[in-house]
């Protein structure tokens, strides 16, 4: 199954810009990709089900709303059976379609990104390591999709259930390479603290988390194709250095913070949270990241709605220790606020559902 419309079908500007960047027709067509889905036929079905089309439509709406494109290696946490059942496949991984090659059209190039149903174990492996590596492991076993990565909604085993040695393989990959996940779209917000009263931000963050019913409870993660420098700010937008800031995340986004520190910052990389409502972006930056706006003397820099936060080597260990509760979040009442007065930083974790 595949959909059309994320790429430019007309070339006359009615849906997408008639040209895409300086390369014109040599650049991407529309958003530059289309979605595909391979589903194993259930013996009880006499015709193809409609739910894959609904999921693809929801993802397309997300792309049109945010302008964020999807690539092989990305993932989507969905939090319920993709077909509405009690299936363990409650999340999606994005891979290169093994059959549909990059196509050059009169209106630009088109990639084909395949949706693959995934268990929680597989989603977490992608977040902690990388999407292509996990997909290569899934291809080994017919039950997890085989070479064509066919989604079987009746699958009850993850790759780790099928082959426990995979856990060590993934752990070694994380140790050697860190995480390729460099950004997610989630519920987040930030505010400059002027009078040391952060209640305003707390209310704003809760408001943001209830705005979008279509994609209210999903998180979309991007691998290294996501460029933190491409956040939606004007080239001439003024940079403002801030003294104190307050960050807020929903629980699912917050659960990734230990990964951000261990798998990204400790490896000298950056990580970006983009608000699903489109009005906030937060990038955590390691000291070795080049081209950032922040430095040791000015660790917080804002450019329009985009905030950069420098996590210095001296701050990293303290931050990891303070956020250790996220490893057992069920034991903590939410919202929970953590403060680092010596670094002028406050962070709040809000519940996923308000």
Name every feature range the model reports, one short phrase each:
Residues 1-39, 70-247:
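Aromatic/basic-lined ligand-recognition segments
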Residues 58-59, 136-139, 331:
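Short, surface-exposed linear patches
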Residues 45, 49, 130-131, 312:
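Short, structured coil/loop segments at alpha-helix boundaries
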Residues 184-354:
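Long C-terminal appendages of very large multidomain proteins
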Residues 55, 77, 130-133, 291, ...:
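Generic alpha-helical propensity signal that fires on short helical segments
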Residues 18-45, 318-324, 340-342, 350-354:
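Short acidic, glycine/tyrosine-flanked loop/strand segments centered on an H-E-D-like triad
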Residues 37-70:
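Compact, glycine/acidic-enriched structural inserts
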């Amino acid at each position: 199954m595949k959909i059309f419309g994320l790429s430019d079908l007309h070339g006359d500007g009615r849906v997408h810009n008639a040209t895409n960047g300086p390369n014109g027709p040599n650049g991407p067509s529309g958003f530059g990709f289309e979605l595909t889905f391979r589903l194993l036929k259930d013996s009880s079905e006499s015709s193809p089900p409609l739910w894959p089309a609904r999921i693809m439509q929801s993802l397309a709406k997300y792309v049109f709303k945010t302008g964020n494109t999807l690539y092989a290696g990305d993932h989507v946490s969905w939090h319920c059976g993709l077909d509405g059942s009690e299936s363990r496949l409650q999340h999606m991984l994005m891979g290169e379609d093994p059959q549909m090659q990059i196509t050059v059209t009169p209106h630009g190039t088109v990639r084909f990104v395949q949706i693959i149903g995934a268990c929680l174990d597989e989603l977490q492996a992608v977040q902690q390591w990388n999407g292509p590596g996990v997909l290569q492991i899934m291809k080994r076993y017919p039950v997890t999709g085989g070479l064509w990565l066919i989604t079987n909604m009746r699958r009850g085993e993850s790759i780790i259930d099928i082959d426990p040695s995979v856990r060590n393989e993934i752990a070694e990959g994380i140790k050697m390479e860190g995480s390729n996940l460099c950004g997610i779209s989630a519920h987040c917000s930030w505010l400059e603290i002027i009078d040391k009263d952060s209640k305003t931000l707390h209310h704003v963050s809760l408001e943001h988390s209830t705005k979008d019913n279509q994609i209210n409870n999903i998180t979309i993660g991007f691998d290294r194709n996501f460029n933190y420098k491409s956040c939606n700010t004007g080239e001439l937008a003024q940079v403002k250095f801030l003294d104190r800031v307050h960050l807020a995340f929903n629980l699912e986004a917050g659960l990734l913070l230990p990964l951000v520190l261990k798998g990204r910052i400790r490896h000298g990389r950056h990580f970006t949270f983009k608000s699903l409502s489109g009005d906030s972006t937060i990038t955590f930056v390691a000291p070795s990241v080049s081209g950032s706006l922040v430095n040791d003397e000015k660790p917080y820099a804002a450019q329009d709605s985009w905030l950069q936060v420098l996590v210095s080597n001296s701050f990293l260990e303290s931050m990891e220790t303070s956020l250790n509760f996220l490893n057992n979040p069920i034991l903590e009442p939410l919202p929970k606020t953590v403060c680092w007065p010596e670094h002028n930083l406050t962070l709040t974790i809000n519940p996923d559902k308000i």
